[in-house]
Structures are given as structure tokens and as C-alpha cells.
């Protein structure tokens, strides 16, 4: 019999952390973060990282594990999450995976086909080509080889364009083809919940309020520390995180403070929309919870898990 794990998914600002803390007080669970922004050290305010008080109530694994100069893939996450899940189940507890990075959940459930390691010669050739023609030209080349990846990748995102082309030149297969080849399935039975307000306008309001609160808490100062380090740039995954990108561009002088706030809120709302789109198209059953009914949401999880474990 496979061990059980719980997935608590949902868009940004939906109340996942609060519910996770409530669940930990009632269930033998340990929390694993499923968030591609919370992995970075020194990025606390703009990622809405759980506070010290919240982490004391519900410690989260896989947060603060990387410097913002480093990259992290879905495959890295899968390896790390499986290790942490094994450790938790060995203690007789249930892994509770909490977060909104849907690609990480997908990688965990379905597995990933191994992608080739970086080839420095090919990367150098692509860099040289980009220096002559521009990354937009390489993005056009990618669109002919792998239209699905090209549609997901911004024409100015040099790192991801380079990687997608590199994979094709090494393997002769597109990144889309390779990622669709299934890897090893998840060795757990999983129960899935998604929390969100039933009214989309409530989520939009929460996102706007939270962004303004981040500004009050010192978000600009947090990004200024990263900006003045000198070794970070806007093409890094960390700085491309929602909110950080807009604040970075503001610090560069690309637009004024008011425009930065407007763009940051819009980008966060777009992220939430993408997360909800993922969830609505999810292939395996999800139990939906209402953010505005936290006690009812907790009781639903407890009841659902109890009936699931009884078979």
C-alpha cells in the first residue's frame, strides 16, 4: 500500500498558508512548500513568505534553499520533494504539499523525462548568434522548431530561449516533445485540494491589498538590496518573479512608482489567472475549498481525508 500525501493548491493570495497552519494543528502532517519563489533566500516580502511566527507553528521545507543567483528546475524540485516526503513518511507522518507552482505538482505526479545536461559549446554558439542577430531572432527560430515552447517563452528571455534551442540541438527533439515523455510516476496516493475565493473579484481585491501591504513592509528596500549586489539581472528566474521584475524595472528607471505598483498588481492577477486555468484543467480529481469559509475548508479536508483513509 502506498503512503498518503496531501496537496493543497490554489492561486496566489488564496489563503493556503493559513489553512496549512490550521491543518497542522489537527493532523500528523509536515509541510513542504511547492513554490518557485519561496526557494530563494533574501526574498521574503515580495514572495509573501510565511512569517517567523507562522513557520514556528508550521515549519515549511524547501524554502530559503537557494541564493537568488541560482536556478532551480521542476526536476530539482521533484528530487528534493521526494526526499523530504520519504523523510516525513519515515517519521509516521503525512507530507502536506502547499503552494501554487502547478508545474512542480505536475512534475511530481507524472514524473519527468530526463533532459540533457548543458553543453557549453552549443550554449556559446547560441550566445554568439544572439549577439549578432538578437534574441528575438533566436525566438523566431525556436517558434519554427517548437511552437509550444516559443509561445510560453518571452522573446527577451534569453536564458529559456537558449535552453530550449540547446535541448533541440543536443537531442534532435523539441523541449515540448521531451517533457511530454512520462517519467517515473509518484509513489504515493495523493488527495488534492484547491482553495480560492468563489468570487474572482475577491481574489483581485486581496491581491491589490497584499501588494500595497508589501510596499508598506519594505518591499522596495528588499529589492534594492538585491539590485545593488551587482551579480543579479532581470533574466534570472528569481528576479523574474512576479513583483520583483516590476520593482527591478522601477529601480532601473523604466517607469515611475505608481506605474510600478499598477504593473505589479496586474502581473500578480495574471499569475492567479494562470494558476486557476491550470487547476480547472487538472487531470486528476480536486476537492475545491472556499477561501472565505476557512473553518469549513478545514473541516472539509479533515472529513475528506478521513473517508479516503478508511477506503
Curated annotation (Swiss-Prot):
GO terms for biological process: tRNA modification. One of its GO terms (molecular function) is ATP binding. ATP binds at residues 10-17. Keywords: ATP-binding, Magnesium, Nucleotide-binding, Transferase, tRNA processing. Residues 35-38, 159-163, 240-245 are annotated as: Interaction with substrate tRNA. Its EC number is 2.5.1.75. Monomer. It holds the Pfam family IPPT. It catalyses: adenosine(37) in tRNA + dimethylallyl diphosphate = N(6)-dimethylallyladenosine(37) in tRNA + diphosphate. Belongs to the IPP transferase family. Catalyzes the transfer of a dimethylallyl group onto the adenine at position 37 in tRNAs that read codons beginning with uridine, leading to the formation of N6-(dimethylallyl)adenosine (i(6)A). Substrate binds at residues 12-17. This is tRNA dimethylallyltransferase.
Amino acid at each position: 500500500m502506498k503512503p498518503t500525501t496531501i496537496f493543497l493548491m490554489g492561486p496566489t493570495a488564496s489563503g493556503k498558508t493559513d489553512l496549512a497552519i490550521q491543518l497542522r494543528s489537527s493532523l500528523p502532517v509536515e509541510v513542504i512548500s511547492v513554490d518557485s519563489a519561496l526557494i530563494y533566500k533574501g526574498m521574503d516580502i515580495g514572495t509573501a513568505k510565511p512569517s517567523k511566527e507562522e513557520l514556528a507553528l508550521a515549519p515549511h521545507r524547501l524554502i530559503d534553499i537557494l541564493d537568488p543567483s541560482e536556478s532551480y528546475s521542476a526536476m530539482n524540485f521533484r528530487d528534493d520533494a521526494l526526499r523530504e516526503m520519504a523523510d516525513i513518511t519515515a517519521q509516521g507522518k503525512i507530507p502536506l504539499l502547499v503552494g501554487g507552482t502547478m508545474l512542480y505538482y505536475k512534475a511530481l505526479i507524472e514524473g519527468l523525462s530526463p533532459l540533457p545536461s548543458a553543453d557549453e559549446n552549443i550554449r556559446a554558439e547560441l550566445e554568439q548568434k544572439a549577439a549578432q542577430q538578437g534574441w528575438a531572432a533566436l525566438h523566431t527560430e525556436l517558434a519554427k522548431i517548437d511552437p509550444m515552447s516559443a509561445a510560453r517563452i518571452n522573446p527577451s528571455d534569453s536564458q529559456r530561449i537558449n535552453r530550449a534551442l540547446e535541448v533541440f540541438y543536443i537531442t534532435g527533439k523539441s523541449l515540448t516533445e521531451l517533457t511530454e515523455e512520462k517519467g517515473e510516476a509518484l509513489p504515493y496516493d495523493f488527495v488534492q485540494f484547491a482553495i480560492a475565493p468563489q468570487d474572482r473579484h475577491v481574489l483581485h481585491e486581496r491581491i491589490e491589498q497584499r501588494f500595497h501591504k508589501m510596499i508598506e513592509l519594505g518591499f522596495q528596500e528588499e529589492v534594492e538590496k538585491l539590485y545593488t549586489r551587482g551579480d543579479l539581472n532581470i533574466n534570472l528566474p528569481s528576479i523574474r518573479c512576479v513583483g520583483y521584475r516590476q520593482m527591478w524595472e522601477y529601480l532601473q528607471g523604466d517607469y515611475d512608482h505608481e506605474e510600478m505598483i499598477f504593473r505589479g498588481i496586474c502581473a500578480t492577477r495574471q499569475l492567479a489567472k494562470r494558476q486557476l486555468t491550470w487547476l480547472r484543467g487538472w487531470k486528476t480529481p480536486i476537492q475545491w475549498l472556499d477561501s472565505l469559509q476557512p473553518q469549513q475548508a478545514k473541516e472539509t479536508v479533515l472529513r475528506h481525508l478521513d473517508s479516503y483513509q478508511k477506503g
